[in-house]
Amino acid sequence: MQLLKDRILKDGQILGNGILKVDSFVNHQVDPALMDACGREFANRFANIGATKILTAEISGIAPALTTGLHLGLPVVYARKTKPITMPDQVYLTLAPSHTKGRMVELIVSPEYLANNEKVLIIDDFL
């Protein structure tokens, strides 16, 4: 994680109110090598928890979740912020604060991809 810390110090921007802008390597533009290193580190740290799936929120969490899933050999499910017409009527839905949007956002997951018996590892860009 030293690589991530160094990159935040080099390219991150503090915007105030607890907001750290990392658009140039995590959110808007993605550094694949950095995300791969993060995924490898997360995989090493969580290899023995028995997770069956990785869960994240669209959109910024997808890159670190995907590389973690790749290194753990696990599928990745991401919570949608809007319900597409292809999703069933019955869904898992919760509200979560979005500090960058300044409001609550819906997070929606289809039960087709997240069963009751899943052991879920949550990976996101900031927790």
Where does each model-flagged region fall?
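Acidic, divalent-metal-coordinating active-site segment for phosphoryl/phosphodiester hydrolysis
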Residues: 126-127
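A generic local structural motif
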Residues: 40-42, 63-64, 106-109
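Short glycine-rich phosphate-binding loop at a beta-alpha junction
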Residues: 50-58
